[in-house]
A protein has these predicted regions:
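N-terminal leader/linker segments that initiate helical-solenoid repeat arrays
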Residues: 19-69, 77-78, 86, 264-265
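Terminal, low-structured helical/coil segments at or just beyond the last alpha-helical repeat
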Residues: 21-28, 173, 222, 226-267
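Structural motif corresponding to the intra-repeat A-B loop/turn of tetratricopeptide repeats
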Residues: 44, 78, 110-111, 149, ...
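Residue-level recognition of tetratricopeptide repeat
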Residues: 63-64, 96-98, 131, 135, ...
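Canonical tetratricopeptide repeat
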Residues: 66, 70, 102-107, 137, ...
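Alpha-helical adaptor scaffolds
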Residues: 105-110, 139-201
Length: 267
């Protein structure tokens, strides 16, 4: 028995050392072909050069998930989704813990493949727990996906839980985007007074949030508060023109669900 334990210990140590060595080799490849090659180019105007560097790195080791993700990322930003997704699938294949939730995010916000996004996030929750990606929990993106699939009650429940969880488990943290989308679910469920109350919470955090003011104006109008609605809409228009908009990191590349557009305001 002692010999078996010793043998197992030695085998485990050998595996650990082998993985360490592999990680070091992969880091060298990433440095050579991403840091010192691809990143010398601007992928917006030099996509071919960027991709060639990464391809050369993958010839050295095709299992480096980060290089696959870096191949995918600029294509997503260029809205070439069908080119991008197979590369991201490769990243998930080789490192699901790191990249599957990111793929769920890309499906939710970029490709608008909401059922697929839900499937990715639910699978991540089973395997890794309800963690965070791109500033929000997996449940937040599942809720956004349900919102876009007109399953408003499911979205409402998840967003309410998300808001409550932040308050209780993250030292009273509140997020204006979370309140914005929770307010949207209330609006879609015709709970207009509740939506207004939620929007006010968002405005307490981000007083010039034009998207919230626009949707609050709609709820005010639908509850017969015409003068208040007119004033709120006027504020939304002015704040929008000043650039006070939905400020998630990726709004530069994609339109988020229910995001205020200039033409909504006659601009």
């Amino acid at each position: 028995m002692k010999n078996l334990i010793l043998l197992f210990t030695l085998f485990s140590a050998a595996l650990s050392f082998s993985q360490e060595e592999k990680n070091k080799e992969q880091e060298k490849i990433v440095e050579e072909f991403l840091t010192n090659c691809a990143e010398k180019y601007n992928y917006t105007i030099q996509m071919a050069e960027w991709q060639e560097c990464l391809d050369n790195g993958l010839k050295k080791d095709s299992t480096i998930a980060y290089l696959w993700q870096q191949k995918a990322m600029p294509y997503f930003k260029a809205r070439k989704y069908e080119i991008a997704m197979p590369f991201l699938d490769k990243a998930v294949k080789f490192n699901p813990k790191r990249w599957q939730s990111y793929r769920g995010f890309m499906k939710c916000i970029f490709t608008k493949s909401y059922k697929d996004a839900i499937a990715d996030f639910e699978d991540c929750k089973k395997k890794f727990g309800n963690s965070y990606v791109m500033d929000h929990s997996y449940d937040f993106y599942i809720a956004i996906s349900y919102l876009q699939l007109n399953e408003y009650e499911k979205a409402e429940k998840l967003l309410q839980n998300y808001v409550t969880e932040m308050l209780e488990k993250r030292n009273g943290l509140e997020h204006h985007t979370a309140y914005f989308y929770l307010g949207i679910t209330k609006y879609e469920l015709k709970k207009y007074e509740e939506a207004i109350a939620i929007y006010d919470k968002a405005l307490k955090i981000y007083p010039n949030f034009s998207d919230v003011k626009y949707h609050k104006a709609i709820c005010l109008l639908l509850t017969g508060k015409n003068d208040d609605a007119k004033e709120m809409l006027s504020q939304a228009k002015e704040d929008f023109k000043k650039g006070y908009k939905l400020n998630e990191d990726n709004v530069f590349y994609e339109t988020y669900p229910y995001q205020l557009q200039g033409y909504f305001l006659g601009l």
